[in-house]
Amino acid sequence: MTRYEMAQIVAKAMAKGANVDKLAAEFADELDSLGVRVANLEKKADNVKITGQIRASYKDVSGDKKDNNMRLRSRLFVNGTINDDWTYTGRFHNEQYVNGNDGKGSAGEDDLDFNWAFVSGRVGGVKMDAGRMDFTYADVVDVRGDGVKLAYGDDVKVTGWVFKGNSDIEMLSDDRVYVAGVETSFGAVDTTVRYYRADTEFDNEIVEVALAGEIAKDLTLRGTWFNGTTDDKAETLAGTDVDTNGWLVGLSYGGAKASEPGSWGVYANYSDRPFATYLLPTNLSGYADAPYALLNESSVAGAAKADGYEGYEIGANVTLAKNIVAAVKYFDLEEREGSKDAQTLWSEVVFTF
């Protein structure tokens, strides 16, 4: 095409453009009104987003605590934009047990629960989440509750939580928990210090000091020290002094990313955790009466006498295809002051859509 032919096309377009301008001027009010309605419609269409997750898992426990079940968890997440600074998140959750039971003596289909409902935004420079959500610092507590999370800062981040547990798990149900923490980095080492105060029957107070850093590409070493105190009731139940200091060390390589097929990771942890140094860590949260059901202790007194647990956990995960991640874990834990032990093999495939 010559430049002259191109100029002819441009001239025709300009002529049509002039006609469009005239029509736009004539129907300015109507177009204005229509434009507002269309813009608002488009904005509202993007205002709510629904995503989902299917989690199929199998757990087999041997040793003094024997149990097995196959569980299917279905979740729908509702995310809505309130304004430029605030959002809303809700979650519908259903559990089905193909075999075994849920640890509370029931099996089969569970009800559909609406178990997340919280808003997120900023008040000045403080980030806030408020409502019903999960409260998880994996080595000390992992429970759903009603409350508030606050965070301030970047290089040095100060955090604060206050919540009341509301899950089916007996531990922390209706107990108020307060958490304050500081997170920062010293060179390549990430450092976290947290203080926990829980209004449980033992009036738990826990201090957690955690360090983590890469020692080689994608290879991370972490270590944590815990100090926990309880009121006299725990020692009365145990019939002896309860230990107050615990520790954990872990090594991990890589990690599966749902958006990257073929990505994978492995890890290993070893821990020595007296009864006073945790509330409900993630590795115990799958048990309805955790922590004492883990080792088949039928009462809080039994758990106090056992004085917590020690042992190791190893695991691996891989992204099989985009948004499909498989994971497997093995725990071997025993009572610190008792004779009971439990071995748990746990596997899961997560589909995200």
Task: Enumerate the predicted regions with their spans.
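N-terminal periplasmic/intermembrane-space "pro-region" immediately following the signal or transit peptide
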Residues: 1-55
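Outer membrane beta-barrel
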Residues: 3, 49, 53-59, 65-192, ...
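Outer-membrane beta-barrel pore domains
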Residues: 2-3, 17, 38, 57-69, ...
